[in-house]
Amino acid sequence: MSSNSINAEARAELAELIKELAVVHGEVTLSSGKKADYYIDVRRATLHARASRLIGQLLREATADWDYDAVGGLTLGADPVATAIMHADGRDINAFVVRKEAKKHGMQRRIEGPDLTGKKVLVVEDTTTTGNSPLTAVAALREAGIEVVGVATVVDRATGADEVIAAEGLPYRSLLGLSDLGLN
């Protein structure tokens, strides 16, 4: 969780919306290969009108002390999070998308959106488990010569992603943890 001051009422409302919309009970296999008795399908919240507005507002608040020009991450989970931040009230912040691999046709880009040359960017994700998805985006951005200032997520599953991201020299913040969703 960020040390920045974020709106506690909005954060509580977001937690309730995610519990209602996105927490699915039943055995599932996570991206890490581990089994869990619930799944947090945060896309059900990031693509919900009210939850999306809260996510954009709260992530802007949580990262207000970070200097970045654009926000994005690995498609698909990061896409609605990035656009929520882009559309939230405040200064202009562009969004971008990082593909898992470059397209084989058209412009053959791996990073889509406005030109990020000389820009500082924030990498985002909907749910962080291992940290591999945001770090895949970080690697692609760094390879393209783009400065990444940090990683932020909506929900952190508390399974070591913070340490993996810190090992890459990046600060990491999350809006919610499992206890906020009644899943500890």
UniProtKB/Swiss-Prot annotation:
Entry binding sites for 5-phospho-alpha-D-ribose 1-diphosphate: R99, K100, K103, H105, E125, D126, T127, T128, T129, T130, G131, N132, S133
Cofactor dependency: Mg(2+)
Catalysed reaction, written as an equation: orotidine 5'-phosphate + diphosphate = orotate + 5-phospho-alpha-D-ribose 1-diphosphate
Molecular-function GO terms, alphabetical: magnesium ion binding; orotate phosphoribosyltransferase activity
InterPro entries xrefs: OPRT, Or_phspho_trans_dom, PRibTrfase_dom, PRTase-like
Superkingdom, natural source: Bacteria
EC number annotated for this UniProt entry: 2.4.2.10
Keywords: Glycosyltransferase, Magnesium, Pyrimidine biosynthesis, Transferase
First and last residue of the signal peptide: none
Enzyme class: transferase
Chain positions recorded as orotate binding sites: T129, R157
GO BP term (any one): pyrimidine nucleobase biosynthetic process
Pathway: Pyrimidine metabolism; UMP biosynthesis via de novo pathway; UMP from orotate: step 1/2
Gene3D superfamilies to which the protein is assigned, alphabetical: 3.40.50.2020
Quaternary state and interactors: Homodimer.
Protein family membership: Belongs to the purine/pyrimidine phosphoribosyltransferase family. PyrE subfamily.
Function comment: Catalyzes the transfer of a ribosyl phosphate group from 5-phosphoribose 1-diphosphate to orotate, leading to the formation of orotidine monophosphate (OMP).
Protein's recorded name: Orotate phosphoribosyltransferase
Source organism per UniProt: Corynebacterium glutamicum (strain ATCC 13032 / DSM 20300 / JCM 1318 / BCRC 11384 / CCUG 27702 / LMG 3730 / NBRC 12168 / NCIMB 10025 / NRRL B-2784 / 534)
